Amino acid sequence: MALLHSGRVLPGIAAAFHPGLAAAASARASSWWTHVEMGPPDPILGVTEAFKRDTNSKKMNLGVGAYRDDNGKPYVLPSVRKAEAQIAAKNLDKEYLPIGGLAEFCKASAELALGENSEVLKSGRFVTVQTISGTGALRIGASFLQRFFKFSRDVFLPKPTWGNHTPIFRDAGMQLQGYRYYDPKTCGFDFTGAVEDISKIPEQSVLLLHACAHNPTGVDPRPEQWKEIATVVKKRNLFAFFDMAYQGFASGDGDKDAWAVRHFIEQGINVCLCQSYAKNMGLYGERVGAFTMVCKDADEAKRVESQLKILIRPMYSNPPLNGARIAAAILNTPDLRKQWLQEVKVMADRIIGMRTQLVSNLKKEGSTHNWQHITDQIGMFCFTGLKPEQVERLIKEFSIYMTKDGRISVAGVTSSNVGYLAHAIHQVTK
């Protein structure tokens, strides 16, 4: 009460005795964020939420970007389980990793991407840092470009591209441009359009390329097309920014999936590269990735590494430990690595097999459309060519969920539901 009598009344105490003051204080406290608008829902998560609410026993979720086994269940690779057991038996500590991550993981990641006999590795003219999966690698790379790529702020993305590419580069301060990639008429690669657009990109700009299993289309250039693209990139003196989220998971052969990256480097094109172990090791929730910059020489690589660490420090200080240990154990233990490569091929082959079965079942349904693009495309995702109104019918009439652009995750297709999917697609396209 002394405070009240003194005339020096604290606001909170005064509000307790005067309801009007309390209301005013409450209004002031709640007024900071009244201008913040509700953000749009994530299109992929929206598909999943609608799927969960559906009670149809035949419902299918073809929107999820994660591998499923032939029973439609999440799959933990046996090689991952073995690696976890080996790590647990060592009773290791939980100390912080260095800013750049687990050294043995970074070295093995670079070898996996560039090849064990790569000249880049032998000369030491590269730097690899551990990142928070592929998304983190992209953001680190984009932030480095924003700070040090003095030639241009423009980054050219394929049309279409993974939805997260746009906000990652935009939020890092880069200017977004595009180049033709997908041809809706053929549901394939618009090679002529892509080369024409790339050849007109201003010199010393950044060009984003999907190394393999293009997301969302599943459409990849053939090796001879990659060669022509590399020739144009070199002629225009463009900086090639590779996103490789599916090495091994696309074709079942890690070397084949990394061919484009290695070819560009062999042609004297210095690139940067983002890797993810979410798909090819099934380490989705562990957030395991890497960012590699190929440099002019070892001295330049050391300077780039120092600046990458300066970028990482205020973002998240250092990367997670557990997933990197798992990936490193698999990559650096010969028997585990051999087992893992076999398991990756099994996953890739299952997806390839589902594509073939889907086309076969569409023919059995009597469909007269050309569905060859389904088997021509590669990787987890398939651009079906379905129109938005056809997708809407699939959702409403058959409880088959996918994004409005007709993209499906082939990983969600199994031998037990592929016939139902083919029947439904035929019904909405005949």
Swiss-Prot record:
The modification Phosphothreonine is found at residues 48, 333. Substrate binds at residues 65, 162, 215, 407. Its EC number is 2.6.1.1, 2.6.1.7. One of its GO terms (cellular component) is mitochondrial matrix. The modification N6-acetyllysine is found at residues 59, 73, 82, 90, 107, 122, 159, 185, 234, 279, 296, 302, 309, 338, 345, 363-364, 387, 396, 404. Residues 1-29 form a transit peptide. Induction: Up-regulated by long-time exposure to alcohol. The modification N6-(pyridoxal phosphate)lysine is found at residue 279. Keywords: Acetylation, Aminotransferase, Cell membrane, Disease variant, Epilepsy, Lipid transport, Membrane, Methylation, Mitochondrion, Nitration, Phosphoprotein, Pyridoxal phosphate, Transferase, Transit peptide, Transport. The modification 3'-nitrotyrosine is found at residue 96. It is an enzyme of class 2 (transferase). The modification Phosphotyrosine is found at residue 96. It holds the Pfam family Aminotran_1_2. The modification N6-succinyllysine is found at residues 73, 90, 107, 122, 159, 185, 227, 296, 309, 338, 363, 396, 404. SUPFAM superfamilies: PLP-dependent transferases (SSF53383). In eukaryotes there are cytoplasmic, mitochondrial and chloroplastic isozymes. Catalyzes the irreversible transamination of the L-tryptophan metabolite L-kynurenine to form kynurenic acid (KA). As a member of the malate-aspartate shuttle, it has a key role in the intracellular NAD(H) redox balance. Is important for metabolite exchange between mitochondria and cytosol, and for amino acid metabolism. Facilitates cellular uptake of long-chain free fatty acids. This is Aspartate aminotransferase, mitochondrial. It comes from Homo sapiens.
